[in-house]
């Protein structure tokens, strides 16, 4: 009867470990799995799908927060507000393409002045000024 019986130290119950901590994630794998099942996206949901989706969502959130934090620091602020998220997303090419149709509430608009509305250069070109003297 090899293999039967209690192993040494098996008296202590195993501590429960969440799927998020097993995967080394902060986002809730169990909750995402529940949403995937309740959403009827498919008849069945694989065990790895919610882990992968949680990792992707966590990465995107970290990316946006890092860029928004940089935007807040550039504006000499210590708190991230929707304006900083808007500036971060719209200044990043890939995030802007991903969230192109998304409206960020209280985000404002991107600063942009059309070139025709900008004042003319005061100095101009030296050749043009010299050419006018000959006439």
Curated annotation (Swiss-Prot):
Q: Which InterPro entries match?
A: Histone-fold (IPR009072), Histone_H2A (IPR002119), Histone_H2A/H2B/H3 (IPR007125), Histone_H2A_C (IPR032454), Histone_H2A_CS (IPR032458)
Q: Which Pfam families match?
A: Histone (PF00125), Histone_H2A_C (PF16211)
Any keyword Protein biosynthesis?
no
Cellular compartment(s):
Nucleus; Chromosome
**Keywords on record:** Chromosome, DNA-binding, Nucleosome core, Nucleus
The keyword DNA-binding appears for this protein:
yes
Please give a single GO biological process term from the UniProt record. Answer: heterochromatin formation
Q: Which GO terms describe its cellular component?
A: nucleosome; nucleus
Gene3D superfamilies in UniProt: Histone, subunit A
GO terms for molecular function, please? Answer: DNA binding; protein heterodimerization activity; structural constituent of chromatin
Q: How does it assemble?
A: The nucleosome is a histone octamer containing two molecules each of H2A, H2B, H3 and H4 assembled in one H3-H4 heterotetramer and two H2A-H2B heterodimers. The octamer wraps approximately 147 bp of DNA.
Sum up the protein's function in the record's words. Answer: Core component of nucleosome. Nucleosomes wrap and compact DNA into chromatin, limiting DNA accessibility to the cellular machineries which require DNA as a template. Histones thereby play a central role in transcription regulation, DNA repair, DNA replication and chromosomal stability. DNA accessibility is regulated via a complex set of post-translational modifications of histones, also called histone code, and nucleosome remodeling.
Tell me its family. Belongs to the histone H2A family.
What is this protein's record name? Answer: Probable histone H2A.2
Please name the taxonomic classification of the source: Eukaryota, Viridiplantae, Streptophyta, Embryophyta, Tracheophyta
